[in-house]
Amino acid sequence: MDLHYSVFVHIDLFEVVPKRGLQRQRVMEFVRSLSNNPFTLGDFTDKDNVLHTRQIKVVGDFAITYWVDDPVKTVMIVDIRSADK
């Protein structure tokens, strides 16, 4: 099955990611991969205030939080932060 979902992320979330280098490359590769693999399981899950189940995936030194809006075929990235926080 070939899935293609749009991935939405607010540009400000990338402020914590280095401007270049291996860490940025890993984060960007993961973000891009969500387009074809939107249901990638995270290392952890939680629920937001409207009860969306959110996946939290640790990629290198960063934790990326996202949820899938399946009816409109989108992945919403809602947080990127240092994985040690």
Predicted regions and their residues:
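Glycine-rich loops and low-complexity Gly/Arg-rich segments
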Residues: 28-33, 81-84
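A near-ubiquitous, low-amplitude feature marking generic local secondary-structure context
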Residues: 10-17, 27, 42, 49, ...
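Basic/aromatic recognition patch in beta-strand/loop cores that engages polyanionic ligands
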Residues: 43-85
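Intrinsic disorder/low-complexity signature
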Residues: 33-34, 76
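Arg/Lys-rich, positively charged N-terminal/basic patches that mediate binding to nucleic acids
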Residues: 1-31
